[in-house]
Each structure stands twice: as C-alpha cells, then as structure tokens.
C-alpha cells in the first residue's frame, strides 16, 4: 500500500505545495474537507491520556482549527497548551509558534536506533490500516462491523499520534487532513449494506492517508521537510472538528454551502462575462484597486487593535507584578490559592498576548498581507499599463483610418471632377471649327493629364485606406487578445490576494481563539473552586499552625511590705553597670579588660558594633575648639586641636560630620579593649556620605556648594543640591557624583580646554616627549584591561558615553579616571581625537606618495602571485615589500618630531593589540582599515567626501597595515618607551645588545601571548607592569623576522617610578650573567630626555648592535 505512486493521490482533493506558496500559514481549503457532520459512533471512546500530557509533547506545534473530534478521541494531540487546571501547568502556546522555533529534542532521529524505532512505528501504523481495511470491507457480520471498525481506527490513529508526538516535524497539513477524511469516511460508511460507492471512497481515503504519511516520513528521513506544511497551533477546544467549519452537526451538508457553490462561477465564465460587457477590464482593474485599498484598511485596523491589546497585556503584567507580592505575602488568607492562580493566569495571558501580537506583526497577518498588497499593486499597475498601451494603439489606428478614409473620399471627388472636365473639353473641341483645333487640343491634353494625376492619387488614397483598415483590424484583434490576457491576469492576482487574505484571517482568528478560548474555562474553574471554600477555613488552619505554649496560670496574692534599709537603688545600678553580662552603652564599651573580663568576647563584639554605628552621627555643635578622640593604647578619651582645612570654613553641619568621621576612624583604628576592629575601612563622612560616589569622586573632599557654578560632569549650571571640592574647587551636581570621572588634583582645577580639533603641535607642547596626554591615557587603559577584548577599535562605543568622556577630558585633562569606562568608549575617544585633528598624524604632504607606494605594493603583490601560481616561492613579493618598507622608513624620518613620537607610540600599542589577535580578532589588516582614514587622509576639499578619498581607502589601510606589520623595520632606530610614562622615566625595555656586543636572536612569537608595557603615570593610580618574555630564535625567513622586530626586546623588569639607576643584571643568551643594566642607563638627576639606542643591523636573520663602549651618557 505504501509503495504506490503518489500520482494516484491527485485523484483526491488535497493541498499541493504550489497552492500553498502564497499563504503564510497554509490551511486546508473547503474542497478538501468532508461535507457531512455525522453523529459520533458509540464505540469510539476517548483514551485515558490527559490533555496536559498530550500537550507536553506537542506544545510547540501548530495545527488547524479543523481537526476532527474523532482524531481527538483516537488520541491525537489537539491542543498546543495544557488545559487550565488547578495545577499551574499552563504554558503559552506561542512559545514556539513558528517552524523556526520547533523543539530540537526529538526533531530528527539521532541515530540508527531512532530510525529503527521510527520504521517500526510506521510498520505498526501500516498494520493498523490493513486491519481497518479488512474490518470495514468484510462481507459478514454487517451490523457488528461498526464498533470493530471504530476500534481498529482508534488503534491506527493512536500509533500515528505517538509517532507525531515523538517527531513533531511529521505533523503536516496533508497527513492530518487525510486523517480527518478517513475518520469521516469510517463514520459515514453504511455497514448495513454493501454500497460500492462507500467502498471506493473508503479505499481512496485509506490510500490518501497511507501515501501522505509515507511521503512525509520519507522527506523527514531525507531532511527535506517543508516548513510551510507545518500546522498552526489549534485552539484548546477538543470538540472542534473539520466538519464544524460548515456549521452545526446535521445529516446532510448545509444549504448555504450548496447555494454558495451554485452562485460561484468558474474562472472561465467570469472572464467571458467581462469580455462580453463594455468596460470589463476597467471594472476588473477598479475592483483590484479597491481590493488593495481594502487590504490597507485591514492592516491598519489590525495594527491598531493589536497595539491596544499589547498595551492591555503589558498593563496587566505590570499590575500582576506589582500586586502579586503583596497578595501572596501573608499565608492562610481566604481564597489565597484561587487568587494566586488567577494572578498566574493573568501573567500567562499577558505573555501570550504579547507573543501573539509579535507573531501577528511578523509572521501570520501584517507582514504577509503587506507584502501581498505591494505585489498586488505592482501587478495591477503592470496590467493596467499593458491594457492602456493596447488601447492607445487601437486609438491611433482608428485615427489613421479616419484620416485615410477622408483623404480617399477627397481624392475620388477630385478624380470625378477631372473626368467631367475632360469630357466637357472633348465636347467643346468637337463643337468648334477646324481653325481652333490647336488651342482646344492643348487644353484637352492638359485636362487629360490632370485627370490621370487625380486617378493616380485616388488609387494611392484607396491603398492607404485599405492599409489603415487592415491595421485597425489588427489592433482591434490585439486589443481583444490583451483584454483576455489582462482579465485572466487580474483574476489570478485577485485570487492570490484572496488566498492570502483568507490564510491570514484564518491564522489571525485561530490565534485569537487560541488566546481567548482558555479564559472562560479558567473563570469557570476558579468559580467552581471558590464554591468549595468554607468560610473560616484558612483562619482555622492559621490558628492550628501557631506554635505557642499554653498560657501560664497567673495568681494574684497580697504581699505585705517588708522594709530593708541596706538596699540602695544607686548602689544597685552602679554595681550592675560593671556586670559583664549586663554591660551596655559607653560604660561597657570603655570598661578595661580586667573589669569587663576577656571571656565575654562575643557580647563585647556586639556592643562594639552598636557603638560603631553611633559614632557616625554628628557630634553636638557645642564642641567647637577641640574634638574628642581615642587613645588607642589606653582606651581613654582625650582632646586635641582641630586642624584647619585648606579651603573655606565649613558650616556647623559639615563640622559635625567631619568630627563624626574622625571619631569613627578612631574607633575603627583600634578597639577599646586593644583588639583590632572588624571593619578597617571607615564609612564615608560628610554631607554626601549617603550618595553612591564613583571612584574618581571619592578622591575629592566634598562640601556643599554655596554659589552657582557649572557642573564639570554634565556641563550644566548647578544651583541647588550641588557639591564642591575644597581642594580643586570642582563643582558637580549631587546626582553626577555617581558618574564623575575627574579625579582631584589637589590644586585649583583649570578652565575647560579645547582639546578635540586643536592643532596637534599645540597639544604636544604640554608633554616632554611630544605625545598628547589623551593618547597616553587611552592607550594605557586599553592595554591594562582590554588587550583581549574582542573587536577592540572595531566596535564603536555608546555615543552618549563617548561624548561625556570627551567632555571629561576637556574639563579634567589628565585627571580623568578611566577604570570604570567601557573599553570600546575609550577606543572611540582615541579614534575621535585623532580623526578631528586639523592635520592628520601623517601630514598631508606625505599622502600622495604613501598612497602611490601602497598602489605599487598591491600591484607588485598581484603580479608576484600571478607569476608564482603553481610554483613555490615569494621572493618577488618580499622584495616589493622590502622596497616599500625602505621608502616608508625614509618618509617617516621626515615627519615632525611630535608627530613621529606619537605615531611610534601608537604603532607600538597596535602591535600589542595584534599580538592578542587570537582573542581580540583584530589583525593588522583590520587595524589598517580602522586607522587608515584616521591617520592618513588627503587635504580637505570643498566636496564633503571626494571620490578619490573613497577609492584610496584600501591604499590607506595598506599603508597602516604595513607600518604595523613591519614596525621594526620602519622604526628600527627608535628607543622603546613604556606606554603611559609622562615624566620620561627611563624604563628602556628591550635592549638587543649587551656590553660585549652579544647578538640576541629574533623572537618569532611571544610565549604567553602579549607583553604589556609598564606605566608610571602621575595622573592616574593605575599601573601597567611589564611581562618579560624570554628571547627565542627561529628559522623563519628574514622578512618575517623583521616584521616582528619589536618582539625581540629583552624583558627588563623595573620597579614602578624608579628615579635611580637600576642595579639589575641582564641574563645572557646562554643563561650566563650578562652586563649590568646600569651600563645602559644615563644620569638620572634632572634628566628628562632619553639617550638614543645604538644602531641595530640585520645579519643572517639576527639583530646585532654595538658594544657598551660606544654608548655615552647624556646630561641635560
């Protein structure tokens, strides 16, 4: 049965993939559904499987609303969601509403065992169908066949349901439509008599489900499952069937269906009617136009309705989140479980509605209908244009025909006149005498010539007229052909749009029904559950769970007065104050160890905690000249003079806060009993101690702002709730203290600096080495914590944060704190600074020569690749690269000193970025693309973006890539500086020669991935430490070694902020002690310049240098 050809299936009404192409959610059409709603057979009972269990396996599938109730009775999972019950097992059916979100578990067979299991299930299903066929078609036991057939049908469908629940991708439209048809045929079969038509229809339905299921399994095993055939999520009504789409359950088909079929004309008759009537094409085009407007109105209506529903769902979710905690806070409240479940249901309903709105917008309604409308309009305009073109051709032919007809008549009249004149001339010649014959003959000849010309013109006009008549007939026929074609195309477009509207409408109302169908059930369930509650039940439960002892029996007796003279309240209290068990307050905290006892450590610790909380309160204002402190050695209180602050006098409240901070620090520094405190760090004091301060804000001594000033963080004026630093006079909003990025410089902060867009030569004057502070600051922070960040310099930062960081640099200069900023924001600031320079780092005058070098290099590389294709070797490409590197070295030497120093500093940093290429994914090529237009750009012109600059982007990137890769060759004579050193500290790392001229081999790759430089910055408390890597030799080519020249530097670990000559000893190549580092150092007293390194040369793939005798100290 499963081996028959699928073409036999074409005899039965089915859904082809071609018809489903225009539908976003293909549904079964009316021609494929059974037309009768027969009564249920008593022998087909629903299985014991609960709906929630069924939904657990197929909760993410979509199914049509038309699945038969008998499929449900046979075990088909009809609902994508569990029925609302008292257990909270409801899940939103839209959790996987699209085929792309189907569950991965069980989607495809994992191995041979799963395929074997699937094939075994298919065999069981085939056996069930064979049994069903034998049971239905047997000739004996006519009346007893009905319950037996229903039992066989249920068994076969249960097997099918198990397969579909295990492999959800088998749940297709064709399979379940065929199942519904088979169920209808089994119900409608007349078992009392052998009707041949019933047998043929039953066999056809059986063949249909067999072929459909086998084809679906085959496509599933081959991985060719069409996602468009997956079913939509059905409503949760298990009684819904395919027959219910036609109305109530009557014995025959409803009358409205028959009337609809009688009134519906075939497409050919519709076209014939429009062809025969006048203006048929125009009427069809107008209908198509109205239909496009109708689709637009539908989309607008559904969009507004969906927006309202989404707002309602979000508002409902917000109400549930706000009220759930307060409602469920107290246990044992009446009907608490009911309202808890109602809250859960409302939350799930809100989630479902939000997801349903998203599905409507992107999958099922708005997007498909919008695309269909656009396509509908495009096709309508094309058909309209072709129809109007054919009409214009016919009109032109008719106009030509009228002109030709008029000309033909005129020529014929002229010919008749000419003939009459000739006849008249002949008569006159015959009536005259022989003496006048010469003049008459001449006139006669002339009139004959005119008559001949008129005749020729009449014949030409007749020919033209006949041609125009033929052309008009041709154009008329072409217009008729165009009319037929246009009507057929218009009807096709309209039917496609109808199908899209139908599918979208079915999907929409199915989705809405699925969302709203559980609501009445939920409310009814909550109502019935509420009826079961007995008043006072929860109160009794609450009282029963109280863990209280029995109330003691209290007796009231008279006690006579007894006098005791030795008793004294004062002595009693004073004695109790030294009791270590009852000690509390300052007396207990200040008691000496011998009185308080050392065994009571835990109580004393508790009392210290209470005391520590109290000392943060402001002291009384009456204490003006002295402050109360603690002597950490004896625990006694003493008085000391208050030190005056460097700023203006603070208010009394600030004085109290400062005194409280001092006492708190005294209490925190040592315990009263001589023990270490628990919390060594004191709480922040002052008027802003309760505000979350940033790292930079904690470096300021803040007080309340007295006069209006401009906030250095947000660049707006501060009038109220402002803070001011006593030392640097920085003003800031109270709320801006949480994000303040400017540290305290312990001197008055200067005014705002125009940093971005400033001339580079002016910016470089502020630093001794010519590298602007913003470049050092950003590079140091990136190397400290962002060398491994993926996409550094390629990923842009957040625009608002970048603007605030730029503003902080202009306000605070080198005092900006970057430890809390995003690495991408910092890199964006650096790129923005370099990009906004009036003249780029590589001057304008080098642009054309550098671009020419890049062009020549790319051309030589392409020629070398073409020449070396099919053979080994790349010497020509290496030679071209070496030539370009040599020319780059010469050009870079002509750069201004500050530009060269900054470029050298930046390229060293980019080399460290490249060393971490495996982590940050930033190759030299990527960095060249990022920094090419930034460091190298042409002189600006009147045009916004010139075409040449766009063409030169690859060449700019090539130049920067070459500078990064061959950095060691281009800048081989440059000394190595530690990034971030702003005082010119002599941290010369990477010397390649020893005192006796020892040759160090080149290093191919860093062993531990990267080598970060040391930073001793006077404007930031962050330091970068050198990671020393041992030198290693390799056998690679000389060019590749030279491209990693800077990796050959020996790691010399130097203490931070070293201001004296180092006495460390270098290690030689073979592990033996090398020369002392002091031989390479210059005099450090008042020395702010560096001695240049000796010249390095390439000999046999190794770097050699001069001896230490060639190096002389330089004094400044």
Curated annotation (Swiss-Prot):
F-BAR domain location: 268-538
Domain of life: Eukaryota
UniProt keyword terms in alphabetical order: Cell membrane, Cell projection, Coiled coil, Cytoplasm, GTPase activation, Membrane, Metal-binding, Phosphoprotein, Zinc, Zinc-finger
Arginine finger, annotated site positions: 794
Disulfide bonds: none
Cellular component GO terms, alphabetical: cytoplasm; ruffle membrane
InterPro entries named among the record's database cross-references: AH/BAR_dom_sf (IPR027267), C1-like_sf (IPR046349), F_BAR (IPR031160), FCH_dom (IPR001060), GMIP/FCHO2-like_FCH (IPR054713), PE/DAG-bd (IPR002219), RHG29_45_N (IPR057028), Rho_GTPase_activation_prot (IPR008936)
Residues spanning the signal sequence: none
Main location: cytoplasm
Stretches with biased composition (Basic and acidic residues): 448-457
PROSITE patterns for this protein: F_BAR, RHOGAP, ZF_DAG_PE_1, ZF_DAG_PE_2
ZnF region ranges: Phorbol-ester/DAG-type: 699-744
GO biological process annotation, one example: signal transduction
Protein name per UniProt: Rho GTPase-activating protein 45
Gene, per the UniProt record: Arhgap45
């Amino acid at each position: 049965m499963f081996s028959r050809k699928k073409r036999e299936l074409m005899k039965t009404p089915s859904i082809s993939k071609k018809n489903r192409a225009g539908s976003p959610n293909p549904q079964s059409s009316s021609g494929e559904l059974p037309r009768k709603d027969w009564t249920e057979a008593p022998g087909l009972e629903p299985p014991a499987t609960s709906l929630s269990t069924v939904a657990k396996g197929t909760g993410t599938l979509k199914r049509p609303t038309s699945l038969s109730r008998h499929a449900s009775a046979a075990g088909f999972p009809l609902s994508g969601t569990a029925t609302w019950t008292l257990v909270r097992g409801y899940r939103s059916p839209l959790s996987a509403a699209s085929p792309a979100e189907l569950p991965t578990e069980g989607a495809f067979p994992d191995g041979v065992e799963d395929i074997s299991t699937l094939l075994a299930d298919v065999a069981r299903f085939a056996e069930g169908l064979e049994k069903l066929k034998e049971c239905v078609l047997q000739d004996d036991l006519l009346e007893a066949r009905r319950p037996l057939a229903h039992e066989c049908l249920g068994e076969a469908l249960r097997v099918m349901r198990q397969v579909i629940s295990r492999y959800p991708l088998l749940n297709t439209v064709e399979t379940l439509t065929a199942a519904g048809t088979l169920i209808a045929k089994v119900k409608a079969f007349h078992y009392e008599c052998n009707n041949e038509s019933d047998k043929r229809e039953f066999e056809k339905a059986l063949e249909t489900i067999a072929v459909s299921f086998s084809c679906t399994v085959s496509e599933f095993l081959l991985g060719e499952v069409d996602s468009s055939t997956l079913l939509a999520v059905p409503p949760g009504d298990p009684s819904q069937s395919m027959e219910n789409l036609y109305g109530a359950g009557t014995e025959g088909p409803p009358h409205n269906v028959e009337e609809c079929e009688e009134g519906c004309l075939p497409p050919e008759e519709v076209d014939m009617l429009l062809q025969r009537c006048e203006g048929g094409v125009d009427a069809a085009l107008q209908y198509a136009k109205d239909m496009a407007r109708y689709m637009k109105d539908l989309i607008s209506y559904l969009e507004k309705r969906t927006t309202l529903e989404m707002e309602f769902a979000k508002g409902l979710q917000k109400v549930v989140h706000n009220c759930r905690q307060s409602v469920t806070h107290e246990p044992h409240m009446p009907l608490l479980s009911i309202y808890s479940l109602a809250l859960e249901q409302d939350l799930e309903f809100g989630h479902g509605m939000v997801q349903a709105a998203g599905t409507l917008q992107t999958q099922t309604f708005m997007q498909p209908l919008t695309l269909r409308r656009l396509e509908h309009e495009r096709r309508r305009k094309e058909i309209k244009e072709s129809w109007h073109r054919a009409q214009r051709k016919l009109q032109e032919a008719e106009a030509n025909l009228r002109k030709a007809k008029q000309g033909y008549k005129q020529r014929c009249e002229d010919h008749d006149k000419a003939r009459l004149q000739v006849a008249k001339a002949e008569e006159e010649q015959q009536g005259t005498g022989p003496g006048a014959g010469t003049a008459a003959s001449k006139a006669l000849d002339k009139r004959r010539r005119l008559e001949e010309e008129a005749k020729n013109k009449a014949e030409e006009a007749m020919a033209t007229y006949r041609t125009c008549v033929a052309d008009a007939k041709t154009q008329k026929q072409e217009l008729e052909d165009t009319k037929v074609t246009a009507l057929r195309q218009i009807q096709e477009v309209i039917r496609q749009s109808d199908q899209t509207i139908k599918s979208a409408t079915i999907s929409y109302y199915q989705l809405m029904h699925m969302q709203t169908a559980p609501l009445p059930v939920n409310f009814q369930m909550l109502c019935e559950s509420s009826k079961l509650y007995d008043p006072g039940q929860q109160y009794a439960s609450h009282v029963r769970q109280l863990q209280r002892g029995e109330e003691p029996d209290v007796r009231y007796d008279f006690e006579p007065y007894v006098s005791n003279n030795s008793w004294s309240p004062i002595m009693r209290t004073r004695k109790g104050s030294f009791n270590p068990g009852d000690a509390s307050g300052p007396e207990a905290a200040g008691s000496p160890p011998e009185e308080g006892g050392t065994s009571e450590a835990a109580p004393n610790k508790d009392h210290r905690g209470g005391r520590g909380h109290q000392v943060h309160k402001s002291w009384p204002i009456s204490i003006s000249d002295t402050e109360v402190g603690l002597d950490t050695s004896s625990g006694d209180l003493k008085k000391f003079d208050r030190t005056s602050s460097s700023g203006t006098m603070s208010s009394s409240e600030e004085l109290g806060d400062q005194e409280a901070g001092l006492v708190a620090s005294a209490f925190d520094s040592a315990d009263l009993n001589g023990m270490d405190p628990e919390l060594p760090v004191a709480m922040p004091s002052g008027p802003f101690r309760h505000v979350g301060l940033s790292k930079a804000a904690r470096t300021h001594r803040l007080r309340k702002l007295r006069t209006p000033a401009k906030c250095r963080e947000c660049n707006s004026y501060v009038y109220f709730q402002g803070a001011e630093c006593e030392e640097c006079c920085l003003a800031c909003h109270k709320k801006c203290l949480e994000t303040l990025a400017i540290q305290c410089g312990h001197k008055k902060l200067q005014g705002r600096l125009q940093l971005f867009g400033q001339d580079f030569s002016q910016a470089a004057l502020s630093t001794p080495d010519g590298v602007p502070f913003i470049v050092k600051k950003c590079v140091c922070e990136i190397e400290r914590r962002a060398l491994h960040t993926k996409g550094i310099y390629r990923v842009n930062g957040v625009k608002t944060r970048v603007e605030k960081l730029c503003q902080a640099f202009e306000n605070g200069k080198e005092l900006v704190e970057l430890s809390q900023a995003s690495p991408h924001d910092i890199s964006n600031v650096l790129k923005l600074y370099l990009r906004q320079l009036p003249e780029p780092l590589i001057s304008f005058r080098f642009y054309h020569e550098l671009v020419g070098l890049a062009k020549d290099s790319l051309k030589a590389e392409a020629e070398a690749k073409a020449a070396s294709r099919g053979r080994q070797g790349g010497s020509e490409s290496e030679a071209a690269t070496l030539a370009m590197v040599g020319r780059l070295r010469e050009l870079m030497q002509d750069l201004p000193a500050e530009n060269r120093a900054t470029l050298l500093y930046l390229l060293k940093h980019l080399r460290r970025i490249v060393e971490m290429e495996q982590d940050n994914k930033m190759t030299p090529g990527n960095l060249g693309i990022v920094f090419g237009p930034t460091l190298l750009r042409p002189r600006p012109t009147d045009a916004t973006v010139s075409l040449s600059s766009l063409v030169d982007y690859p060449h700019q990137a090539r130049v920067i890539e070459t500078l990064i890769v061959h950095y060691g060759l281009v800048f081989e004579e440059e000394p190595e500086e530690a990034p971030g050193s702003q005082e010119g500290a002599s941290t010369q790392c990477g010397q390649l020669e020893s005192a006796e001229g020892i040759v160090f081999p080149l290093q191919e790759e860093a062993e531990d991935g990267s080598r970060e430089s040391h930073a001793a910055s006077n404007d930031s408390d962050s330091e970068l430490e050198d990671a020393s890597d041992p030198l290693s030799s390799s056998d690679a080519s000389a060019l590749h070694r030279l491209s990693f020249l800077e990796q050959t530097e020996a790691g010399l670990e130097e203490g931070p902020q070293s201001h004296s000559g180092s006495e460390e000893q270098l290690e030689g190549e073979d592990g033996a002690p090398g020369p002392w580092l002091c031989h390479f150092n210059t005099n450090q007293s008042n020395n702010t310049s560096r001695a240049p390194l000796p010249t390095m040369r390439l000999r046999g793939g190794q770097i050699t240098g001069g001896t230490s005798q060639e190096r002389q100290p330089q004094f400044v």
